[in-house]
């Protein structure tokens, strides 16, 4: 079952001064080869795509981490996915939870729409405020679910600040 895609976000990823489109999607609780895709805003052709371990539903935000003049992509979703992706070629810069364990076992659940705030850690990059919570694997009748929480993440390293 494919889920509803994230809101389309736009920025120029190929240097042609036309905004390109980044969108997330995927399948709930399933690895997907095409869950993050970037499309050329001029002709609609695929610029790059990335796989993910679970559904990606957060709207992408952009900031140039690689100093190549092209915005890099930050996008989020289920199973502790908060990713920084090279906007030029789609390669992974960092993954907040890159481990081969269930993020829920570590108290990390779904990441929702990231937002940039000021530079909290002094590295000259705007950092990320994001909410995390909502154990989608828990039964609907379970009343004592873990609470969600707000987190501040370094956009440059992907490390937790607060």
Predicted regions and their residues:
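Solenoidal tandem-repeat scaffolds enriched in leucines and small polar residues
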Residues: 76-81, 107-113, 131-133, 144
């Amino acid at each position: 079952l494919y889920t509803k895609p994230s809101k389309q976000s736009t920025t120029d990823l190929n240097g042609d001064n036309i905004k390109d489109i980044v969108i997330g999607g995927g399948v709930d609780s399933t690895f997907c080869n095409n869950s993050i895709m970037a499309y050329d805003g001029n002709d609609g052709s695929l610029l790059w795509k990335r796989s993910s371990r679970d559904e990606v539903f957060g709207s992408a935000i952009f900031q140039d981490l690689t100093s190549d003049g092209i915005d890099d992509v930050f996008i989020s979703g289920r199973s502790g996915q908060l990713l920084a992706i090279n906007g030029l070629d789609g390669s992974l810069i960092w993954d907040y939870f890159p481990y081969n364990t269930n993020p829920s076992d570590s108290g990390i659940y779904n990441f929702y729409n990231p937002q940039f705030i000021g530079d909290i850690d002094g590295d000259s990059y705007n950092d990320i405020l994001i909410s995390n919570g909502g154990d989608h694997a828990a039964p609907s009748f379970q009343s004592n679910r873990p609470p969600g929480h707000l987190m501040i993440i370094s956009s440059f390293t992907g490390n937790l600040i607060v």
